Amino acid sequence: MSIRAKRRKRASPTDLYRTCKQAGTCPPDIIPRVEQNTLADKILKWGSLGVFFGGLGIGTGSGTGGRTGYIPVGSRPTTVVDIGPTPRPPVIIEPVGASEPSIVTLVEDSSIINAGASHPTFTGTGGFEVTTSTVTDPAVLDITPSGTSVQVSSSSFLNPLYTEPAIVEAPQTGEVSGHVLVSTATSGSHGYEEIPMQTFATSGGSGTEPISSTPLPGVRRVAGPRLYSRANQQVQVRDPAFLARPADLVTFDNPVYDPEETIIFQHPDLHEPPDPDFLDIVALHRPALTSRRGTVRFSRLGRRATLRTRSGKQIGARVHFYHDISPIGTEELEMEPLLPPASTDNTDMLYDVYADSDVLQPLLDELPAAPRGSLSLADTAVSATSASTLRGSTTVPLSSGIDVPVYTGPDIEPPNVPGMGPLIPVAPSLPSSVYIFGGDYYLMPSYVLWPKRRKRVHYFFADGFVAA
């Protein structure tokens, strides 16, 4: 007997309408029911065009009789009247102003009426008497002092118990004009000295720079650009315009352009730059000065825009453009010569050669003519300088000709290295057998036969040693 599958209840029309309306997969009876477009709804719509049933409540509603409900014929609906307290008029509360006191007094102050001055009492019967004068000249007052010099005296005192820094001001310079002295009021005595200020360094700013800045709590090291990274392409620029006008190598000159440290280039279409090394360059960052292999190098990092995606993003490699400004010379130490320089003006009689006359005379007779460039002793004069010894010594001055160079300084004798004779090859030695006679012979510890190992047979003498 097969078990019949349980039938699942379909969802409500409202839930089905929410999910299948946008996808367009609704059953044919869902949309008319939810949108009230069934056959019954259409009959009511068409019938209501010619028949009006008023408030009878005939429709597809809940059957409660409409908004007012069912009432008997010939009567009126009851009206619920709510009887409550009589409403009071609102009381306007006036806020207290800033000049009004915060404490309200219960008893008002009595007003004081000032009576004023008393009326004058007249004793005469004719009223006031008017006095007249016949003098018509105006009165002139002489305010000129009798003396010709002006004397000004002042006194000041200092109260140590009271000091007001906000009021104390430096006295201003007085102005004297004729006999009139105009001065400013001072508070106490002040001693000061006017020192002219001198500007040592000026900057080419616009004058709107801030006077001071907030100091940093510590020194922060700014990391330099990684110019020689593997991700950067190294390009050497030989044009010196790269130092001051790098934009001229990417685009042509624009007189309206305002240079900055980081230069951004906008290329709407393909173009040919003045320098082919700067092809597809869209940005050149701030310059940097470095020392590289003994030279001062001016560097800038650039970014290419080789590819452009549909979203407008540019993709390209980073390029390191550099220009070597000047080489850095090696540090040279100032060397001082230990001996004075040679003088070629008078080089005669620089060295004296001493020899015995008995030995020198036979050598001079047998000496052949000296070749060019050698030392000649035949033309020199022989004179005895000492007669105190058995054999007299003769002074022979050294003649310096044009072909014989003469140098001053100590005599240096090179070492006498004897020459090496011919080398005789040694006959190769033949290996010979070594015979050991004895009974004490031990193997090396590494060659000891341990149990559970294969047997080893040693045939060489080097695998063991002889007991002494």
UniProtKB/Swiss-Prot annotation:
<dbReference type="GO" id="GO:0019028">
    <property type="term" value="C:viral capsid"/>
</dbReference>
<keyword id="KW-1160">Virus entry into host cell</keyword>
<dbReference type="GO" id="GO:0075521">
    <property type="term" value="P:microtubule-dependent intracellular transport of viral material towards nucleus"/>
</dbReference>
<keyword id="KW-0597">Phosphoprotein</keyword>
<feature type="short sequence motif" description="Nuclear localization signal">
    <location>
        <begin position="449"/>
        <end position="457"/>
    </location>
</feature>
<feature type="short sequence motif" description="Nuclear localization signal">
    <location>
        <begin position="1"/>
        <end position="11"/>
    </location>
</feature>
<dbReference type="GO" id="GO:0003677">
    <property type="term" value="F:DNA binding"/>
</dbReference>
<dbReference type="GO" id="GO:0043657">
    <property type="term" value="C:host cell"/>
</dbReference>
<dbReference type="GO" id="GO:0075732">
    <property type="term" value="P:viral penetration into host nucleus"/>
</dbReference>
<dbReference type="GO" id="GO:0042025">
    <property type="term" value="C:host cell nucleus"/>
</dbReference>
<protein>
    <recommendedName>
        <fullName>Minor capsid protein L2</fullName>
    </recommendedName>
</protein>
<keyword id="KW-0167">Capsid protein</keyword>
<keyword id="KW-1039">Host endosome</keyword>
<dbReference type="GO" id="GO:0005198">
    <property type="term" value="F:structural molecule activity"/>
</dbReference>
<keyword id="KW-1015">Disulfide bond</keyword>
<keyword id="KW-1177">Microtubular inwards viral transport</keyword>
<comment type="subunit">
    <text>Interacts with major capsid protein L1. Interacts with E2; this interaction inhibits E2 transcriptional activity but not the DNA replication function E2. Interacts with host GADD45GIP1. Interacts with host HSPA8; this interaction is required for L2 nuclear translocation. Interacts with host importins KPNB2 and KPNB3. Forms a complex with importin alpha2-beta1 heterodimers via interaction with the importin alpha2 adapter. Interacts with host DYNLT1; this interaction is essential for virus intracellular transport during entry.</text>
</comment>
<keyword id="KW-1176">Cytoplasmic inwards viral transport</keyword>
<comment type="function">
    <text>Minor protein of the capsid that localizes along the inner surface of the virion, within the central cavities beneath the L1 pentamers. Plays a role in capsid stabilization through interaction with the major capsid protein L1. Once the virion enters the host cell, L2 escorts the genomic DNA into the nucleus by promoting escape from the endosomal compartments and traffic through the host Golgi network.</text>
</comment>
<dbReference type="Pfam" id="PF00513">
    <property type="entry name" value="Late_protein_L2"/>
</dbReference>
<keyword id="KW-0945">Host-virus interaction</keyword>
<keyword id="KW-1040">Host Golgi apparatus</keyword>
<dbReference type="GO" id="GO:0044174">
    <property type="term" value="C:host cell endosome"/>
</dbReference>
<dbReference type="GO" id="GO:0044177">
    <property type="term" value="C:host cell Golgi apparatus"/>
</dbReference>
<feature type="disulfide bond">
    <location>
        <begin position="20"/>
        <end position="26"/>
    </location>
</feature>
<keyword id="KW-0426">Late protein</keyword>
<comment type="similarity">
    <text>Belongs to the papillomaviridae L2 protein family.</text>
</comment>
<dbReference type="InterPro" id="IPR000784">
    <property type="entry name" value="Late_L2"/>
</dbReference>
<keyword id="KW-0238">DNA-binding</keyword>
<keyword id="KW-0946">Virion</keyword>
<keyword id="KW-1163">Viral penetration into host nucleus</keyword>
<dbReference type="GO" id="GO:0046718">
    <property type="term" value="P:symbiont entry into host cell"/>
</dbReference>
<keyword id="KW-1048">Host nucleus</keyword>
